[in-house]
Amino acid sequence: MLFSSLFLLPLVALGTSVNALSTITQPLANYKWPTQFVRSGEANIQVLVQGAGPTVVILPSYGRDGGDDYNYFTDSLVDAGYLVLRPQPRGTFESTGPMTNVTLEELAADVAAVIDTLGGAQAIVIGHAFGTFLAKVSSVLYPEKIPAIVVAAPGGIELPTNIAGMPFITGNTSLPISDRLVALQTAFFAPDHDAHIWLDGWYPDVLAMEHAAVEAYGRLSSHWGGADTAQVLEVIPADDPFQPKSQWNVTTNLYPNRATLKVIADASHALFPEQGKAVVEAILPWLNLQSSKI
């Protein structure tokens, strides 16, 4: 089963180019994070903007926002001298835009508009889980804007069938908490980690939108490493059931000249709230090397 089948499963009980005139509005007052908005076609994307330096864009996981899960990571990159942009998916926080019949190309255009408007037209893109899918597609469509990508907890190119549908349980807020918690512990958190912290933060409408976009896009295997010119860092949680150990070396074997692998111990698919410091230590040296080239 190919990786894309994770996103092609039925979504039970859940409901192409950058706009040449992408514009920015003024920051909101008294918001939790420094915030600006970027126009992308019919969408108005809220972006959390922190730091200064080479630009890094963070794309969150399936059906979730790019807020609290990435605060420690963002603060660490800001302290290291980076401008960190966290565009919020349509339907999360105050990002707005069409939510039906949305394509991955349109979501990638949102990313590109943010890079053009706030990031000096070039950025390293870090995707987490579903965000790795969008990072890869964005780099294929906009290789001149995205010279390097980090794919954190990307899942394998083949998935265990009993795991592939778990996001549609954890993200279905109409289900009993006990059912969702079992799915979270099984698929997203390593043993002895508290899965309760991810009971909140899900957006069923966003999950449905992203699912439909990936379903329409189809298989990703033809550009598993993003654009042919992109440098790739793959960060694999050692306990991630979405990427069994037999799948750990697929990316580096396919792209030995441009892919690097790091494994994070005692972490599963959620990764960032589980092992924040280890994630920073795995990514930052590679990020420093890549950012020195742009």
Label each region the model flagged.
Residues Y62, A238-P241, D266-S268:
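Acidic beta-to-alpha connecting loop that harbors the catalytic carboxylate
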Residues H211-L254, T260:
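Conserved serine/cysteine hydrolase catalytic core
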Residues L2-V56, D79-Y82, N288-I294:
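Alpha/beta-hydrolase fold catalytic core
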Residues D79, R86-I126:
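Active-site loop/oxyanion-hole signature of alpha/beta-hydrolase fold enzymes
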Residues F133-V140, I146-L175:
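Flexible "cap/lid" loop of the alpha/beta hydrolase fold
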Residues R258-I294:
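Catalytic active-site module of serine/aspartate enzymes centered on a nucleophile-bearing elbow/loop
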